Amino acid sequence: MFNKKSNDALLAGIRQGKTLTHNEMLSLIVGLSIPSILAQVTNVLMFYIDAAMVGKLGATASASIGLVESATWLFGGLCSAVSLGFSVQVAHFIGANDFVKARQVMRHALVETLAFSLLVTLCASLIAFRLPGWLRGGDDIAHDASLYFLIYALSVPFLQLGILSSNMLKSAGNMQIPSIMSVLMCVLDVCFNYLFIYVAGLGVPGAALGTVLSIAVVASVEAWFALFRSSILALRLDKERFVWMWSYVRNAVKISAPIAAQYVLMSGAQIVSTYIVAPLGNFAIAANTFAITAESLCYMPGYGIGDAATTLVGQSMGAGQYGLCRSFAKLTVGMGMAVMALMGVVMYVFAPEMIGLMTPVEEIRDLGTQVLRIEAFAEPMFAAAIVGNSVCVGAGDTLKPSLMNLASMWGVRLTLAAVLAHWYGLQGVWTAMAIELTFRGTLFLIRLKWGAWLKAEGGVEKNNADGGRQALL
């Protein structure tokens, strides 16, 4: 189940058109999910470390990061969206056994994503010292919040390279290297944070520097594995001269544009949520930030299973095995809901300890515990939304799922949060979140059951000019 050779053999069987048994599908899902789950959990631990180290500096330092943290998520979201446009194509080509085109797509991705990340860095740097004011942050936290945001923004090119390399390796079925790199990033983050926050005495900017340096080191190593060590994607395997193909870029835009728009508007919604929370005071801002970090430990398994779903659905679709696509969709969504239901129970029971790890301030701990227990009830349906969306991405179906996410976030969560915050404070904001996640999960279950997410079944061309499977349209 956890043997890489066994996973590779099963993936090769998909590409060759073989029929997998139910046990083989489960084995492959678990085998690909476990490393990805570990990677996701490690990423959360890194945020825990940042929060815990900064939390010891007091509520003001925690609030300064919490004020702009939702804005920094936009960087990762945009970088992920742009890289997915190319990595989904790579998964489809690998599924069709066309490794040459898979490497061609990756070359295009390197150029396009570098240009994009530099543009994002420039734009973010220009607004860094205005953002805290826009978010209604107090004067006592504005300066540190601006510095944290600016330093993090400068890491975007490395962040983009790391996300792209990770997604490419996952598209090829290699979940182990991204997982190991996530562990390495966590270790480096601890070391760099200790050095800059405590030894150098830099406080909040030191936390940003520690994170940025760990991102840069890990991105460089991960890119080396993707570009030079992968048995499928290593650039040295190409014998022909590289030729620019605009069709790959156009396909990437078709896949990425809805996801990028979704990330922008979803991050905008998170920023609006911060805007709603900010007037509730520094304790509420800090409790909100810590609760989000604590909850992420519970939903990261869903994202890990979602990574496996994207890879398996993508390669199955590239191989023309559309029945297998649906089987993987059902199994991954069911597994995600079961795992996150269990994590919801854990979160409810251990909420005080989870918040307590990050702050010694009693008011923040009490408030954070209350909102975590509200959210625990929504975890299974949150899993349906996470894994369901990943299934659709693997199939190249991104427009309607993006619209579903946006309608749910803006039409349900923010509307309810604005109303409930007035009457119930932070607890009202998180009640709105729990209701919205349940609604969104329901939408994705309906989409997977009755929607036309598997486009190839609807009569789209199944053979390309070379006689192989049509992987992209």
Where are the language model's segments positioned?
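Small-residue-rich hydrophobic transmembrane alpha-helices
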Residues: S62-L122, L159-P178, T274, A287-A351, ...
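Transmembrane helical elements of multi-pass membrane transporters/channels
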Residues: G31-D50, I151, G162, S214-V218, ...
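Helix-terminus/linker motif at the lipid-water interface of multi-pass membrane proteins
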Residues: V41-A63, R130-D139, L195-L202, V264-L297, ...
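Short runs within selected transmembrane alpha-helices of multi-pass transporters and secretion channels
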Residues: S83, Y152-K170, P178-D189, A207-E222, ...
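Alpha-helical transmembrane segments of multipass membrane proteins
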Residues: Y48-A52, L164-M168, V187-L195, A223, ...
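Transmembrane alpha-helix boundary and packing residues in multipass membrane permease domains
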Residues: S36, Q40, A51-A52, E69, ...
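N-terminal transmembrane alpha-helices
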Residues: L20-A52, K56-L57, W73-G85, Q89, ...
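Short alpha-helical transmembrane segments in multi-pass integral membrane proteins
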Residues: M1-S36, V90-S155, V199-A257, V313-A378, ...
